[in-house]
Amino acid sequence: MTGHRFRISIVRFIASYFIAVAIAAFATSARAQANIDVDERRTTPVPHRYIHGILGDAKFQIALPDNWNGEFAMGARGFSGDENASGAFKTVGLQKGYAYALSDQGWNRFTIIDQPEDKYYESRRRILQLTQYTKALISRYYGKPARRTFMVGGSNGGHNTKMMVEDYPEEYDGGLAGYGITSHIEWMGSNTRFVRNFDVIASRIDDIIVKRTARPNWDPATTPLSPPLTPDQLQALLNIYNMPAHVGGLAFNIGRVPGSEYRWPPASAKWPLGSYTAILGYATTSVAKFDRFYDPNGDGVLSLDEIKAWDPNLSPPPVANDLRRFDNTGDLQHPIIIGHGSHDPIVSPGETLVYKRLVEARFGVAGARKLLAVYFIPGMGHGGAEYDAALPAMFNALEAWVDYRESGGRTGSPPPNVLVGGLGSYPRN
């Protein structure tokens, strides 16, 4: 090649390179542009600027309090929620001065089956996208960046909180993860196992609840009801208590705990806290999306009985390969506080127990206590007034813990051995 041609080639290469960089920068900028449909002043729970819009294909809300504490609480919604399903996290956060944001994550539980482009895994990208967008907005609005950013959320949002703090330690300084899923594939499998086994014991659930209430340590295998359960009924009851599962190489029990039976039936005047219908609903709206191969009789439609029979252990490898990407790992660099109801029928307390073990497997028991604090709330189901009333104390504990870690113990404090909430006190697990 002549020197002239060589110089032309170099010039073309450099020009092409900078054009590519410019295009990439433009694309990134375009992706970060939000379409705002509401930007207004609101006064409850405290005076703040409220913004609503769409970023990518995800709807969002942002709240910027007048009395800003210099920090940012990034929310994560529940499995059935949207960008407005903030629960008490927004209320308490704004009252304490945090800027707050929440995304619908680009998918909806009730329509995702009809939207091929929507994926559960999209949550990670959409949460990160809104986090970065809100941080930039905070800097412009208040004239300085947020000093800290926390992830907060319950249920699916509790899972997302753990996921984002694990995966993006440069973005988040810690999190409040309420009653969260640890493995989505195991959680959905536990839902179908629950409903198909509950159907077998449904005619005897009143007797089971009465017996458990009278004798909290009752063992149905050794102390029969009168009249006794049939062998099939006894096995079905035991199947609800004991559901083998695994995540991150650890085996655990994702079953529903003894003592929570009053939360199992369909909700009714007699059993107002019953959750059967809700658990069945998760399965009916989700199994076909979780497992695109599942169609036992090949007719292209999943019947209710087929949905109840789904078992992820029998699904082909691509199902686990896809959904296991969503498993929490326990790989923390910043602290997380978890609150979970001891009688939760929707997300088994076993999911939080195994998450604690995941962290311990990486850092040892002593090391895990420097990164994770777990509090079980006696008798609470899937979230509730007890958790909401404890949120101010949890925010305070997280702030003090981060202070303690960042200062090398000179300021702040580790998480309390007993968390004193508004409706009770809860020992650290």
Residue ranges of each PLM-predicted region?
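N-terminal secretory signal peptides that target proteins for export/translocation
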Residues: 1-11
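Bacterial N-terminal signal peptides
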Residues: 13-25
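Sec/Tat signal peptide C-region and signal peptidase I cleavage site
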Residues: 28-32
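C-terminal His-loop and adjacent cap/lid subdomain of alpha/beta-hydrolase
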Residues: 33-429
